[in-house]
Amino acid sequence: YDKYAKLFYECQKNVYGNVTHYYATDPFHEGGNTGDMSTSDVSSEVLNSMLEFDKDAVWVIQAWQGNPSAGLINGLNGRKEHALVLDLYAEKDTHWNDSSYSGGKEFQKTPWVYCMLNNFGGRMGLHGHMDNIVSGVVDAANNSEMLTGIGITPEGSQNNPVLYDLLFETVWCDDATKTLTEIDTDQW
């Protein structure tokens, strides 16, 4: 693994240059097959390789279908400042506030991002979970210790601009010292 990880990071740097400290990999995406591998050991090796290549590396991890497991989070070995979990489908299926997911709320106190997935496979359609977006972002902003931002994770983004506008409008306020409140979508 070490040989290929080093080669991967070197090739990425050669192609893209020094453009980021964020790296995404999902060794057990959508369940995967762990075989006889320990998810904690795999997680530790993945992060070790990233940090060997880039001391400021941040591993971007998707929260989706059982990932990240408690073992994967435990494998970070206390280096959670080098991880960022994307709560991939938070507007419909939140995981940040589920204490049974990943071994504890907020992914065992790992920095995370509230994400709106909304679109699967680039399918066209005007649909979405507006009420969930409005209440979910406010709930996360007001009740989370580890929330670091909001984002979008669609499989196709050239549709339904209303939802994207709404998501990013939910965190906009003129006075950052005030408690975030829900947007009245009837007035919006």
Regions found by a protein language model. Give the residues of each.
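Catalytic-core regions of glycoside hydrolase
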Residues: 1-188
